[in-house]
Structures are given as structure tokens and as C-alpha cells.
């Protein structure tokens, strides 16, 4: 920047620079900050982890965070390659992953605990020193627990190998042990290692669904140091339920009952399902509900025959209510073009058939005691009373409100970060590769504008701010996003819930995928989408989840010559057989991209007691031509902008446009 340009720019920004001068009141202050920022720009970029489609599998998710997708184990192997046996390295890793539980186990087995403390504390200091090496001291300090901040800083920055400091470092460790603080210190160090190994976490949708622990995943995320989430179709269903959308509420209950996992509903959010159980027993007491038996293979708890039958009755009851409620929205919103999803009025119970697309199909279940053939979409008095009670339960859940606030604060329909475009499922497209126009409240949107508008409507549905017409539309639209043909979170011809439940013929179950899912295999289409979202850089990518990658059938998660990465590898246990693996983590560190392919996680107990880790295979996706530094990232661009502003402030000071002030001593 030339002197003339600086002078003109300073004059234009003088009011802002006067505000900046409050933080940097002297030339020395501004100069020091420039030096600090320039130094940060030349540190290696932090490690980003990308995960998707967790589907309530809290134990596997928690373990992947704790072991940083194998990064902790790799660092332990590098540091102690020839100085520790494999069994000792395994024990150290297990301690880092689960410090509280592992300590209890070790204290019950270890004969010389003081010696173990001495050895282990020194090992943890070495690991922590390694994982903190790419960060500034300031950043590490902010991550430290307050009670041990000073001590950990001393241990990280002083070496026991240095003759002048060896006694000093040794005495710190001895005193930690003698004062009875070793356990707390070990826990603090292990948590710090976990935190520093992952700098930024991206969740590309579907925290919720069939698994038992979505609420536990949300508990972890709400306390996590740095993350973002791109909403998925299952997430939007729960967001709709939290917004008071009755169809979304019926859907989430149906999904939980279908897989026999009520933990998130009942234990996590305190949803009272007793009214549903009472209604189901009365309405379907003599009905075997054979089509609605829960898929108990992956249920959170073993169930006896009586419980299984009750869940089947509840499952059927809420399914029929769901179809009725869907009909109300579809009639109210003809612009959704979902008339083909209104099937109740096509049922002929006397003949036991349903009429679809000019053909009669035999119903597998003809016991519909709450269906009025004259007005099939009308809820019975008992159903209305039931859904009102369930709605109250959802609206009263404080834990759900907390999790949703976190979801909105850290989430969105998409994210652009460090030359990567992240979204869960789709960008609606035409078969010719152009962006598909989607009409919302009388106006057409496509591409990035569509996702921005959808994001806005989701927030309107939950927070209920704005014009009444838009609030009411958003309240219905949040359900449309779950199964509407032009939803960026679905993008299929239909959701065949009714057909799969009641019709044998597989031809009726077919859901045609939108054009995006085939077009994304082409590099030029990916470039078109990246351009639409303003993603720049030599190495730019789209990162999706949503569609499981069947690696056991030879399917490749890396598509379009490396421009497209699909990382739904099947965290959910029911998908393990389908994909052949148990999930992916995409890791983006200073040297490039790696895709980590996980085997199934056995259990937290085995990880603690036997040191059993997830077996992972690392695939190199892309190596950078040079090591990526902070200056190569979005954060680096922000820092460079700050440096330019500080340089203008220096110019203003040195040319008398702003007067220096003495810094007040604190």
C-alpha cells in the first residue's frame, strides 16, 4: 500500500481508527500487536475434523472426539516409539481418552501408585507439549483450567532435560503428588490434550435419529470449545418438533418407537409418553400391530414381550396421527405440491385396498379404528387431546430449549470455511446442471439464495419473529423440509412412509433422488456450485453427508476428481452392514486432507478396561504442496485485515491525525 493510498484510507477510516486507538493508545501498543499478529500468521493451521450422520450414536462420537480420530494414538506412538511397550502406550492412550474412569481402575490395581503418578505425569507433559506446539502461548493459556493454569504453563515451557531447570520441574511434579492433587491434575492434562488435538469441529448434519444418545451428543457439543453444525434432515425434524410443529412431533416419536429407542425423548428431554401409551392400549388393545414391532436389535435396552407389544401399539397410533396431521398441512399449503402424500381418502377399508396412481394395492393392515371414512384427516377427540398433551410436553422441555439455542447459535444450512463448502444433503438442480428455482411465498430462489432463504425460515419458525404470514408459513415449511421434493435437506420425489408401512409391492416404495445426487460426480458441476457460494482457492471442496457410502461395494467417498467428499460412512449401528464400516472422519491439518475410516466401536467399558480403541484406516485424500499456515486460512485473512487497520493507526499516530494517550496502569 503506497503512502498516498494509506493517507486517503486513514482519512476515510478516521472515526473507526479513533475507536481502535482506545485498545491500542500508543505507537508501542499498536506495533506490538502487529508483531504478535504477524507471528501468528506463520504458525501451522489448526486441525479441523469433519463428522456427519451421527444418528444418536453418542458413545462412538464421544470416543472419536477423545481419540481425535486416531491422532492421539499416533502422537503417543511418535513420542514414545521405542521407549514404551505397546501395552504401555495403549494404557496411556486409554488414560488420555477416559481419565476419570481409568484412574479409578488403575488405583484399584496399581501397587506403587506414587511411582505410577511420577511416570505418568511426565508422560502427559510430553504429549501435551507436542499437541500444543502449533499454538501461541496465549491460545494454550486460554484453554487451561484456571486452577492449574500457572503450573501447566511452567511444565509446558520448561524442560526437565535442561540442567538448570530439571530440579525445578521435578519438584513441581513431586509436589502435585504430595499435596494429593495428582488425580485432578492428570484429568486436567488429559482433557487439555483432547482439546488441543482438535482445533475446530464441523458436524455436517444428522445428530438426531435412531440412536439412543442424541441428547448426550448435544450435551457434549454445547460445552465444546469450537464447533459448527450444518443442519441435516433428521435435525430439522427435531427442530420442527421443538418449534411446536405437530407433524414433526409425531414424526420424531414415530422414529424413536420404530427403533425402540426412547432414551432421547424420555430421559433426555423429559417427554411424557404415558398419554400415548394409554391411548394406544385403548385404541389398539386387541390389535397385534405386527407391522409396527420395533427394530429391537439396536434398541437402547432389552425389552420383554409385553413392552415390545406396547411400543408397537404406540408406534401404530402415532403413525396414523402423523398421516392425518400431514393431510392438514398439505391441504393448507397447495404450493407444497404434495397431494400425492394424502392417501387416507384413497383407502377403502371394506375392500382392504388403497388406490394409488390408478391402481389398487392391498393393505397389509386394515384395522383403522380412528379413521372416519367421511373425514379421514380429522383427528378423533381422543387423538386431539393426546396431541395437545404431547405438544405441552415438548414446549415445556428446558433441556430441549437449551439444545436448540445451541443448534441455532452454532448451526446453519451451510458453511464456507477455509475453501470448503459444507452442507448436509443437496442443492436442488435441474438435470441439465442448472440450479432449480424453488418458489417460497411467491418468490423464486435458487442456489445459494435458496439456502439463505431456507435458513431464515427455519429461524422464523422457531423464534416466531416477523410478519404473521411468514411466521405461519415457516411453521409449516419446517415440516416440508423433512420430506418435500424441493427441500435441500431431502431432494427426492416423495417420502414413501405410508407405502413402506402398508403396501407389499416394492414399486410403491421407490423414492427418486433429485438430479444433484448424480450431477455431483462431475467436476464442472462441483466448480459451478463452489463459484455460486463464493468459495475460492486452489484446493476447494464440497463436503456432504446424508447418503451412506457403501465402501463394502466399492463405492468411493472421494468424487469429482477430489472436489466432492461424501463422509457419511455409517456411524449408526443399523448402517454398519450396509456400508461395511462404522463412519468416517475427514481430517484437514496443515499438511493436507486425510479420510479416516472407522471400524465399529465396541464399548466405552472395553476402551477403559482393556484399552480397546477404534480401529481406523487413514486414506490420504490430498497433500498440500506446502505446509498450510494460519495465513492461508480464513482466520489468517481476518488477522491480515486487522494488521492493515493497525498499520493505518500507526500512520495516524505518526502524522498527528490521532494523538497518543498514556496507558492507564491497571
From Swiss-Prot:
Protein name per the record: Fructose-1,6-bisphosphatase class 3
InterPro entries: FBPtase_class3 (IPR009164), Metallo-depent_PP-like (IPR029052)
Pfam families: FBPase_2
Gene: fbp
Cofactor: Mn(2+)
Family as reported in the entry's similarity comment: Belongs to the FBPase class 3 family.
Top-rank lineage group of the source organism: Bacteria
EC number of this enzyme: 3.1.3.11
Metabolic or biological pathway: Carbohydrate biosynthesis; gluconeogenesis
GO molecular function: fructose 1,6-bisphosphate 1-phosphatase activity
Amino acid at each position: 500500500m503506497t503512502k498516498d493510498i494509506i493517507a486517503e484510507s486513514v482519512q476515510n477510516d478516521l472515526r473507526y481508527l479513533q475507536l481502535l486507538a482506545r485498545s491500542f493508545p500508543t505507537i508501542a501498543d499498536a506495533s506490538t500487536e502487529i508483531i504478535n499478529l504477524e507471528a501468528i500468521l506463520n504458525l501451522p493451521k489448526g486441525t479441523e475434523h469433519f463428522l456427519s450422520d451421527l444418528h444418536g450414536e453418542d458413545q462412538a462420537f464421544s470416543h472419536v472426539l477423545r481419540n481425535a480420530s486416531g491422532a492421539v494414538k499416533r502422537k503417543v506412538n511418535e513420542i514414545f516409539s521405542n521407549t514404551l511397550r505397546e501395552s504401555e502406550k495403549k494404557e496411556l492412550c486409554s488414560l488420555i481418552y477416559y481419565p476419570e474412569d481409568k484412574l479409578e481402575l488403575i488405583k484399584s490395581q496399581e501397587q506403587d501408585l506414587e511411582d505410577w503418578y511420577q511416570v505418568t505425569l511426565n508422560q502427559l507433559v510430553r504429549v501435551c507439549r507436542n499437541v500444543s506446539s502449533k499454538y501461541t502461548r496465549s491460545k494454550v493459556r486460554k484453554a487451561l483450567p484456571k486452577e492449574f493454569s500457572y503450573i501447566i504453563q511452567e511444565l509446558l515451557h520448561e524442560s526437565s532435560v535442561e540442567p538448570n531447570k530439571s530440579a525445578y520441574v521435578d519438584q513441581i511434579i513431586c509436589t502435585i503428588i504430595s499435596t494429593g492433587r495428582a488425580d485432578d491434575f492428570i484429568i486436567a492434562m488429559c482433557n487439555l490434550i483432547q482439546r488441543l488435538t482438535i482445533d475446530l469441529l464441523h458436524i455436517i448434519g444428522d445428530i438426531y435419529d435412531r440412536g439412543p444418545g442424541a441428547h448426550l451428543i448435544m450435551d457434549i457439543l454445547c460445552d465444546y470449545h469450537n464447533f459448527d453444525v450444518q443442519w441435516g434432515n433428521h435435525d430439522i425434524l427435531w427442530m420442527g418438533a421443538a418449534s411446536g410443529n405437530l407433524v414433526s412431533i409425531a414424526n420424531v416419536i414415530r422414529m424413536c418407537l420404530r427403533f425402540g429407542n426412547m432414551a432421547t425423548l424420555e430421559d433426555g428431554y423429559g417427554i411424557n409418553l404415558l398419554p400415548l401409551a394409554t391411548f394406544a392400549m385403548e385404541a389398539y388393545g386387541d390389535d397385534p400391530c405386527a407391522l409396527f414391532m420395533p427394530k429391537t436389535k439396536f434398541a437402547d435396552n432389552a425389552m420383554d414381550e409385553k413392552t415390545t407389544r406396547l411400543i408397537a401399539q404406540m408406534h401404530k397410533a402415532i403413525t396414523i396421527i402423523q398421516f392425518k396431521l400431514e393431510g392438514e398441512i398439505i391441504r393448507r399449503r397447495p404450493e407444497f405440491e404434495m397431494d400425492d402424500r394424502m392417501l387416507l381418502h384413497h383407502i377403502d377399508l371394506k375392500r382392504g385396498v388403497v388406490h394409488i396412481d390408478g391402481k389398487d394395492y392391498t393393505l397389509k393392515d386394515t384395522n383403522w379404528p380412528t379413521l372416519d371414512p367421511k373425514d379421514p384427516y380429522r383427528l378423533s377427540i381422543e387423538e386431539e387431546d393426546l396431541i395437545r398433551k404431547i405438544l405441552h410436553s415438548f414446549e415445556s422441555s428446558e433441556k430441549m430449549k437449551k439444545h436448540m439455542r445451541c443448534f441455532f447459535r452454532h448451526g446453519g444450512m451451510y458453511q464456507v470455511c477455509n475453501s470448503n463448502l459444507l452442507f448436509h444433503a443437496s442443492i436442488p438442480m435441474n438435470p441439465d446442471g442448472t440450479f432449480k428455482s424453488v418458489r417460497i411465498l411467491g418468490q423464486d430462489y435458487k442456489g445459494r439464495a435458496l439456502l439463505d432463504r431456507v435458513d431464515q425460515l427455519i429461524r422464523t419458525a422457531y423464534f416466531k419473529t416477523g410478519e404473521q404470514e411468514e411466521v405461519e408459513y415457516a411453521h409449516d415449511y419446517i415440516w416440508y423440509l423433512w420430506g418435500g421434493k424441493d427441500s435441500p435437506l431431502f431432494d427426492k420425489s416423495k417420502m414413501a412412509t405410508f407405502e413402506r408401512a402398508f403396501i407389499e409391492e416394492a414399486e410403491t416404495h421407490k423414492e427418486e433422488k433429485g438430479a444433484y445426487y448424480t450431477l455431483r460426480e462431475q467436476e464442472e458441476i462441483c466448480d459451478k456450485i463452489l463459484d455460486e457460494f463464493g468459495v475460492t482457492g486452489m484446493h476447494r471442496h464440497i463436503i456432504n453427508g446424508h447418503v451412506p457410502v457403501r465402501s463394502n461395494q466399492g463405492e468411493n467417498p472421494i468424487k469429482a476428481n477430489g472436489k466432492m467428499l461424501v463422509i457419511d460412512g455409517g456411524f449408526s449401528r443399523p448402517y454398519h452392514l450396509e456400508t461395511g464400516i462404522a463412519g468416517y472422519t475427514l481430517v484437514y491439518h496443515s499438511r493436507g486432507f486425510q479420510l479416516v475410516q472407522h471400524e465399529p466401536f465396541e464399548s466405552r467399558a472395553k476402551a477403559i478396561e482393556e484399552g480397546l480403541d477404534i480401529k481406523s484406516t487413514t486414506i490420504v485424500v490430498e497433500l498440500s504442496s506446502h505446509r498450510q499456515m494460519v495465513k492461508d486460512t480464513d482466520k489468517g485473512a481476518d488477522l491480515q485485515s486487522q494488521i492493515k487497520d493497525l498499520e493505518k493507526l500507526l500512520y495516524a499516530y505518526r502524522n498527528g491525525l490521532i494523538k497518543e494517550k498514556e496507558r492507564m496502569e491497571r
